[in-house]
Design a protein with these regions (language model features):
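Short, acidic, metal-binding catalytic loop of nucleotide-sugar glycosyltransferases
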Residues: 24-33
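Acceptor/aglycone-binding surface of glycosyltransferases and processive sugar-polymer synthases
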Residues: 66-81, 86, 98-178, 205-215, ...
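Acidic donor-diphosphate engagement hotspot in glycosyltransferases and nucleotidyltransferases
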Residues: 47, 99-101, 184
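A conserved acidic beta->alpha catalytic loop
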Residues: 40-49
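Active-site acidic short loop of glycosyltransferases
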Residues: 3, 32, 82-85, 110, ...
Length: 245
C-alpha cells in the first residue's frame, strides 16, 4: 500500500453534494500529497451515487465502513485505517479552509503532534452559530486557555491534525460525538507533546443537517474539559494517560 504524506478523514452521512464541491477545492488548493478516507455509516449513503465522479479528482479516495453509527465511531475507524504520518479530520461541509491544509501539514513537519484549526485565534472567525452553542464552545475554549496549560484558544473544534505518533500511543476512550478531539488535545498536552494552532473560519452549515447534539454530548465534553484542567491544577503527569497496549 502506498504511504501518503497525509490522510484526510471525513466522516459522512449523505454528504454527496457537499463532497463534490469540497473535492474541487482540494484539487485547487492542496499541494501536499494526500488521500481522503470517507467514513460512512450505511450502505444506502448517497456517496455511493457519486462514486464515478469521485474518480475524476487528482487524489485517491477510499471508502471506510463505520462498524457502528455516528461521527465518533466513524472518525476512530478512519484514524485506525490510515497509514500516513499524520491525519487531518475535516468536515464534509467546510468550504472555507481547504487552503490551510498545507499550513497545518507544515506545522506537523515542524514538530507539532496536534495542529488546531482555531476559530478563536487572531485571524479566525465563527459566524452563524446558534447562540447557546456559541456561548458553550467559546466559554469552554477560553477558560481552558486561561486556566490550564493547553496552549491553544480553540479546544472544541473537531477540525484538526493529529500525528501518527500520538494516535499510535493514546487510547481514544470517547464514544459519542466529536469529544475524541478534546480528549486527544487534553491527553497530548498531558504527555507534553507539541500543540500549535492556525487561524480558521467557521460558518453554520447551509446544506444538509448538522449532527452536533449539544445536550446529549455535553457530559462527555465535560469529562475531557475537567481532564484538561486537572493536568494543571492537580499536577497530573504523562503517567496518568491511558495508552494503547
Amino acid at each position: 500500500m502506498k504511504k501518503n504524506s497525509l490522510e484526510i478523514v471525513i466522516p459522512i452521512y449523505n454528504e454527496g453534494n457537499n463532497l463534490i464541491k469540497l473535492f474541487k477545492l482540494f484539487d485547487t488548493n492542496v499541494k501536499t500529497d494526500f488521500r481522503v478516507l470517507l467514513c460512512y455509516d450505511k450502505q444506502d449513503d448517497n456517496v455511493f451515487d457519486i462514486l464515478e465522479v469521485l474518480k475524476n479528482f487528482k487524489f485517491e479516495v477510499v471508502l471506510v465502513k463505520n462498524p457502528l453509527n455516528g461521527p465518533c465511531s466513524a472518525v476512530k475507524e478512519g484514524l485506525n485505517f490510515g497509514n500516513s504520518d499524520c491525519v487531518i479530520v475535516y468536515p464534509a461541509d467546510d468550504f472555507l479552509n481547504s487552503d490551510i491544509i498545507d499550513k497545518m501539514y507544515k506545522n506537523f513537519l515542524e514538530g507539532s503532534d496536534i495542529v488546531v484549526a482555531s476559530r478563536f485565534t487572531e485571524g479566525g472567525s465563527m459566524k452563524g452559530c446558534p447562540i447557546l452553542k456559541s456561548i458553550l464552545v467559546r466559554a469552554a475554549s477560553s477558560s481552558l486557555f486561561l486556566l490550564s496549560s493547553i496552549p491553544v484558544r480553540d479546544a472544541s473544534n473537531g477540525f484538526r491534525l493529529f500525528s501518527r505518533r500520538l494516535l499510535e500511543k493514546v487510547e481514544i476512550e470517547s464514544k459519542i460525538g466529536f469529544a475524541y478531539s478534546l480528549e486527544l488535545l487534553s491527553k497530548c498536552n498531558r504527555l507534553r507533546y507539541k500543540i500549535s494552532e492556525i487561524p480558521a473560519q467557521w460558518e453554520e452549515r447551509s446544506e444538509g443537517s448538522s449532527r452536533f447534539k449539544i445536550f446529549s454530548w455535553l457530559p462527555e465534553y465535560l469529562k475531557w474539559y475537567l481532564y484538561g484542567l486537572s493536568t494543571t491544577w492537580l499536577k497530573r503527569g504523562p503517567d496518568r494517560v491511558k495508552i494503547k497496549n
